[in-house]
């Protein structure tokens, strides 16, 4: 009987809602935390109730207005995220959109972001110096 209960648990587990497939996570502010997907090597930004705000957290930066960072795993999907702490909204971006949005908001994007992009795609990112 015990074996049956354990087997049922593992059969049902993959069908749980996406947000529930995580450990408790690391609390980084009063309103959100970084959580790890169960069975994956990926993290995501979640609110206190566990609802996903932005997927793919690899390295992040916290300011008074934003929490932002990037995912170093899948470059063909959204790799950067920005979470607005005032509106409590998060959004994912591809590499170029992420860099543009960081510049638009006056955020300095994480230094390792270009290194991860180079490792995944084999091509370095080149940005013009300020004033050119």
Walk through the language-model features, giving the residues of each.
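Generic detector of ordered, mature protein regions
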Residues: 70-75, 95, 106, 111
């Amino acid at each position: 009987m015990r074996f049956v209960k354990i087997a049922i648990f593992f059969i049902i587990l993959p069908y749980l809602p996406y947000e529930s497939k995580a450990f408790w996570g690391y609390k980084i502010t009063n309103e959100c935390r970084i959580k790890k997907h169960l069975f994956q090597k990926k993290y995501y930004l979640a609110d206190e109730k566990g609802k996903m705000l932005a997927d793919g957290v690899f390295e992040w930066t916290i300011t008074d207005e934003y929490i932002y960072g990037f995912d170093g795993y899948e470059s063909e999907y959204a790799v950067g995220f920005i979470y607005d702490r005032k509106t409590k909204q998060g959004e994912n971006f591809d590499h170029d959109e992420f860099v543009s949005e960081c510049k638009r908001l006056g955020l300095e994007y994480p230094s390792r972001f270009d290194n991860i992009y180079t490792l995944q795609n084999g091509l370095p990112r080149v940005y013009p110096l300020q004033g050119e």
